[in-house]
Every structure is written in C-alpha cells, then in structure tokens.
C-alpha cells in the first residue's frame, strides 16, 4: 500500500547545507544580516520543502556594508625617486620652453591609399626594434601586396634632421609619442651644445676635464652595476645567454659595433620612474665591451660598455668586425627547452616536465616508476638536487623543486630554462615575465644619461625579459625602421614580439594624424 504524500516527504534523505547551494547562500546571507536571517530562513524553507504551496517572501534589500568598516588596504605604490634636473641640451625642465629647431624640408610621404591591415596574424619577418615595448618599425609586404607597418611613433630622417610621426586612436586625439617605442610625450628641446674643450673645462673646474676624448683614451667607465646584479664566477657563454632570451627579442651587440642607446627603455627596467622626464632623444654609441653573467635572481645578465660618438665623426663610426674569438667547442652543442610555469609549478613541490622532444633531449631518459636523482646548476654555479620521476605517464621533478622556487621567487608566468652541454653538464635559469621590472636603481639610469650627454664612457646592465625590451639596439636595425614612409591617414597598429610557433599579439590600433619635425631627436 503506497504511503501518503506526507510520509513520502518525511522519508526523503535530507541534504546538508554544504550539498545544497541554496542553503549555502542562506547561511552567507544570515552572517551578513543577522536581523533578517530568521525571516529569510523561514520563508526560504517553506518554499523549498513545500510542494503544494508557494509562498512569496516579502521583498527586502540587502545593503552593502559601509566602506568605512571595510578592511581593504590601499595598494602600495613605488615611491618616486627624485632625480636632478637635466640640462637644457637634454630637454629637461630648463629646456621645456625652448624653441624647437626649424623644421627641415618636407618629408617624402607615401601614397595616401597605403594602409596597414591590423587583422593580419602572420608573424613578422623583420627584426624587432627594442625599447620599452619592442614595437616593430618599418614596412613589409605580404603575398597579397598589402603593406604592413607596426609602430608606436616613428622618427623619419630628412635632409636636416628627423621628423617624428605621431598617431592617435581618433582624428580628434593628438598623441605625441616618442620614437622610441612608447616613451612618453616629447618636449621641445634646444639644439644640442657641443661639449667644452678640455682646456675650457679645466679652467672651469669641470670634473670631465680629466676624461680623455671618447675613442682616443683608456678611460674606464665608472658606472657600477646594481648590487643585486653582480656577475658570478660561473661562466655564462653567449649561447647560454641566447637560450635564456626570448625568441626574436634577445640580441647582443658585438664589440666594435654601433648601437643606439634609448634612455627611456633603460628606465623602464627600474622599479620606479624618475620624477623628471628623460630626454626625448637617443644616443649613437660604440660598443667597447660586453660581459655576460648571472643576476642574483638567476637571470642572464649582460653588462655593455658604451662610448658615445658624434653623428659627424665618420672616422670613429667605422664598424669593427665581429668578435674573432670563437665560442668554446663544448658550448656549440648546447641544447635547451623552456617551460612556462603554471600555478601548480610554483605552489607545489613538483615541476611537471613537458612532453616534447626538446625536454627529452635535455633530461636523461627514464622508465616508468623510475626515480633518478639529478643535480643541476643555476647560472651562478650553485647546485640544486631534484628527484626526476615518471609516475602515471607524467614526468616531474620532486623533493627540491619548492626550495628552488622559493629561493628564486618564481611566480605564474615566469619561464624555467633548462640547458645541457655536450659533456652532460646541465644548467637551469629563469626568464621573468615582462610585468616584473628588474630591480635596477634610477640613479644608474640618470648617471648613464648624464655620461652619454657629456660623451663619456658608461655602462648599462641589460636583464632580458619576455618581450623586446632591449634598449641598446644595433644601428642598422634602427636605420631600417627609420626609412619607412608614413603619411597622415595611414593605419598603424602595435605588434608585440612573440615566440616561435605562436601568433603575434596585436595591440591598440590607430592612424597617423600628424608629422612633427624634431631636428635634435637623435644625436650624441
């Protein structure tokens, strides 16, 4: 005999509050508003357990708690570092109101119908121009004859100077972005003043009187690298440095080559920006030394010694041949693989090895259920011990990975780089995400800019990131980008440097709306 409906309801298994999402919401509302919890619980229970009656609860509104009682804390910001004002010739505060140099002759503009397709997803083939964002400068043609240009502001050479092309998101918006790759607005600068002769400098008591002329003396740069980025005893070869660099991003100049130094790109690596604007110009320099080492954060570090030269010093601008010293034979067979770190990799004591041939060529071959001890050196020479195991079709590092992760401050988005030489020696390094600035001091950037303006030798430290953030760029790469022909109305877009096998990242889009002339934007 079937039971009455009331008995059937009584024999139903009751759900716990954690199994019933509606009960979970009622408990949360009860904690927020205790004065209304009883009414809300009664009405909700009647609605849920009654199959024959539908009760409509009286409407009421839950008001949020006062913002004064909230526990949110303000986000700490990096303190701005006070920087000494730049001289008038650098376009600092003293030169903001200075008249700009007379505009040069008209710049040959491209055809008005030439546009840039922003929907193209094919990776670009030309080299990336470094700086803050690593945007591409130049023109390219695809198979269909369309013209592609990716810029964030460009200086185009003319007969008596350099003309700057700016672009905005709409015709009503005028954005004056510095060349050099999204570096901020350009201030009108006075023509550059030549440095005083040695005799005049000695009479005035200038400390630069004892500095030999660039390229004709043995002056040693006094700019010191950051204390946190000291070169270790471990030998970091050129191919190891390139393995740690992002594809199409990392680039090392050779000794004797000509490069452009971008001050704003250098300042982009600092934890805080200088209060005073840096000069809206770049410096032509000659590379005198390149030293490779390891940073304290297990990143590949390059210390580049530069000597500024004048644009009209043709004898000193002769390009030197490439480094004659060949790479060691053991480093020529270097193999490597890169693994982007996931949330599990940085929070648990295990590192999931990717299932590809590159990882198999670096790590030793193991069988299922094997547990092999590994010893791998970082770039500073410290040895780390791991257990390399294969469980349930998954290869991983255990027993030691968490110690390495905490010691290097790994976060989601960083990349772990594993390398192996021909003699079986293994190394590992870290390639940081581009959102984490390198802890360089602002004082280093300011000192480098001052020395570049006085044409004194100086040093810069370059800690590579995932994007084209280099600020010491070969001269031919910059000159190729400056030969692009732009005209008002031409569509442009941002393109970020990408890794091999991935589509390029297309950023904001806009169009060229004006061409402004700055005859003193490039010089030394």
Swiss-Prot record:
<dbReference type="InterPro" id="IPR044835">
    <property type="entry name" value="ARF_plant"/>
</dbReference>
<feature type="compositionally biased region" description="Low complexity">
    <location>
        <begin position="110"/>
        <end position="124"/>
    </location>
</feature>
<dbReference type="GO" id="GO:0006355">
    <property type="term" value="P:regulation of DNA-templated transcription"/>
</dbReference>
<keyword id="KW-0805">Transcription regulation</keyword>
<keyword id="KW-0804">Transcription</keyword>
<dbReference type="InterPro" id="IPR003340">
    <property type="entry name" value="B3_DNA-bd"/>
</dbReference>
<dbReference type="Pfam" id="PF02362">
    <property type="entry name" value="B3"/>
</dbReference>
<dbReference type="GO" id="GO:0009725">
    <property type="term" value="P:response to hormone"/>
</dbReference>
<dbReference type="InterPro" id="IPR015300">
    <property type="entry name" value="DNA-bd_pseudobarrel_sf"/>
</dbReference>
<protein>
    <recommendedName>
        <fullName>B3 domain-containing protein Os07g0183700</fullName>
    </recommendedName>
</protein>
<feature type="DNA-binding region" description="TF-B3">
    <location>
        <begin position="336"/>
        <end position="434"/>
    </location>
</feature>
<dbReference type="GO" id="GO:0005634">
    <property type="term" value="C:nucleus"/>
</dbReference>
<keyword id="KW-0238">DNA-binding</keyword>
<feature type="region of interest" description="Disordered">
    <location>
        <begin position="191"/>
        <end position="232"/>
    </location>
</feature>
<feature type="region of interest" description="Disordered">
    <location>
        <begin position="94"/>
        <end position="152"/>
    </location>
</feature>
<dbReference type="GO" id="GO:0003677">
    <property type="term" value="F:DNA binding"/>
</dbReference>
<feature type="compositionally biased region" description="Pro residues">
    <location>
        <begin position="100"/>
        <end position="109"/>
    </location>
</feature>
<keyword id="KW-0539">Nucleus</keyword>
<feature type="compositionally biased region" description="Low complexity">
    <location>
        <begin position="200"/>
        <end position="232"/>
    </location>
</feature>
């Amino acid at each position: 005999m079937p039971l009455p409906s009331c008995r059937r309801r009584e024999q139903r298994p009751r759900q716990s509050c954690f199994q019933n999402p509606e009960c979970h919401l009622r408990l949360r509302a009860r904690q927020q508003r205790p004065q209304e919890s009883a009414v809300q619980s009664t009405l909700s229970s009647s609605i849920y357990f009654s199959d024959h009656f539908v009760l409509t609860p009286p409407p009421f509104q839950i008001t949020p708690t006062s913002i004064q009682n909230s526990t949110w804390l303000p986000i700490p910001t990096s303190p701005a570092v006070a920087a000494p004002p730049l001289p008038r010739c650098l376009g600092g505060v003293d030169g903001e109101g200075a008249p700009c140099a007379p505009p040069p002759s008209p710049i040959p503009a491209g055809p008005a119908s030439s546009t840039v397709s922003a929907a193209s997803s094919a990776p670009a083939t030309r080299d990336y121009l470094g700086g803050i964002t690593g945007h591409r400068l130049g023109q390219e043609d695809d198979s269909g004859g369309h013209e592609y240009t990716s810029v964030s502001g460009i200086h185009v050479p003319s007969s008596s100077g350099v003309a700057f092309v700016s672009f905005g998101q709409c015709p009503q918006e005028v954005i004056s972005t510095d060349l050099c790759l999204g570096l901020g607005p350009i201030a009108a600068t006075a023509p550059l003043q030549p440095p005083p002769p040695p005799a005049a400098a000695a009479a005035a008591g200038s400390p630069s009187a004892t500095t030999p002329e660039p390229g004709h003396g043995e002056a040693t740069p006094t700019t010191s690298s950051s204390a946190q980025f000291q070169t270790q005893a471990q030998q970091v070869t050129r191919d190891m440095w390139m393995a740690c660099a992002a594809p199409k991003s990392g680039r090392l100049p050779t000794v004797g080559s000509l490069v452009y130094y971008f001050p704003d790109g250098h300042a982009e690596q600092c934890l805080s920006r200088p209060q005073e604007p840096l000069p809206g110009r770049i410096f032509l320099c000659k590379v005198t030394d390149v030293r490779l080492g390891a940073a304290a954060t297990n990143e590949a570090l390059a210390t580049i010694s530069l000597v500024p030269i004048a644009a009209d010093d043709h004898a000193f601008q002769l390009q030197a041949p490439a480094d004659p010293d060949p790479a060691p034979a053991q480093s020529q067979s270097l193999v490597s693989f890169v693994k982007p770190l996931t949330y599990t990799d940085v929070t648990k004591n295990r590192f999931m090895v990717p299932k590809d041939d590159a990882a198999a060529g670096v790590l030793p071959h193991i069988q299922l259920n094997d547990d092999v001890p590994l010893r791998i050196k970082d770039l500073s020479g410290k040895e780390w011990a791991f257990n390399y195991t294969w469980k349930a079709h998954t290869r991983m590092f255990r027993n030691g990975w968490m110690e390495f992760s905490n010691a290097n401050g790994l976060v989601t988005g960083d990349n772990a780089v594993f390398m192996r030489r021909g003699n079986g020696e293994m190394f590992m390094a870290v390639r940081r995400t581009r959102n984490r600035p390198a802890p360089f001091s602002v004082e280093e950037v300011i000192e480098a800019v001052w020395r570049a303006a006085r044409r004194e030798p100086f040093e810069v430290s370059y800690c590579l990131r995932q994007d084209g953030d280099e600020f010491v760029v070969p001269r031919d790469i910059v000159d190729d980008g400056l030969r692009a022909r732009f005209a008002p109305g031409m569509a442009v877009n941002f393109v970020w440097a990408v890794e091999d096998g991935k589509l390029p990242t297309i950023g904001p889009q806009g169009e060229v709306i004006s061409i402004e002339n700055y005859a003193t934007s490039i010089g030394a």
